[in-house]
Amino acid sequence: MAGAKRFECPRRRFLMILLDTMVLSERRKAKPNLGVVSYLKSQAPDSIYLSALTIGEIEAGIEKQRSLAPEFAAELAQWLTLMELQFAPFILPVTPAIAKLWGRLCVQTGNKGIDNLIAATALCHNLMVVTRNVTDFESTGVRVFDPFGLPEAAGTAG
């Protein structure tokens, strides 16, 4: 398309990470994966980001539990509120730029799911997605890392 504007996302110079729902949720387990715990402890607090979609995925889980396990749902809701407060400056919304990139990724990968929105968020902000589900992101071209296989004392990736 001659004369069409090429979409560019802003780029940062330092390695920052975007946690997916599974990695964030690991933090609240009674017996979390020690590799994940070690990895998260090794990261600078201001290098860890969440997608607003992660908040939505957790909220969906809370809603599913409300009729099945109301006390558990209440615990999750309280935990989610704490995560929102802790990560408030680091929760990334879906912007028009991210939505456009997501649209391109949908065609490229043949998948219209939330993982592509998370990948688009990471690509636009030059973040590495930290997830257990590496294969869900491979076709997007985003950098991914799985901390679940790390030994307890491990810490860095990238």
Would you name each region that the model predicts?
Residues 141-146:
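Active-site regions of enzymes building and remodeling cell-envelope glycoconjugates
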